[in-house]
Amino acid sequence: MMDNKLDAACDKFTEVIELDPNWAEAWNKRATVLYLMGKYELSQADIDKVLMIEKRHFGALTGQGLVQTALKNYQKAIDSYVEAHKVHPFMKSPMIMMEKLQIELQKQSI
């Protein structure tokens, strides 16, 4: 049932994007749905579009961190969280994620 709802949500956000392709939040919402569906590359493509429209979009930057973590691109994920922290320095989640990812990078280098 959840898959059907995600498919429907993706379709609706696609319709919204077709109506207004310059609305960053529509791209960001579809990126979120695609991430939840496990379609990480497609999610990243939508995030790229969001960041072309609004380079300081906090949600897209943190979402990119999640996508890159899922793809095991830990350094790219860290870079995304660094940018998110610059945009929203009082939000703690990017710092927490950066610390966790630094540990993953250290494990990889052993």
Regions picked out by a protein language model, each given a short descriptive name:
Residues 1-110:
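Alpha-helical tetratricopeptide repeat
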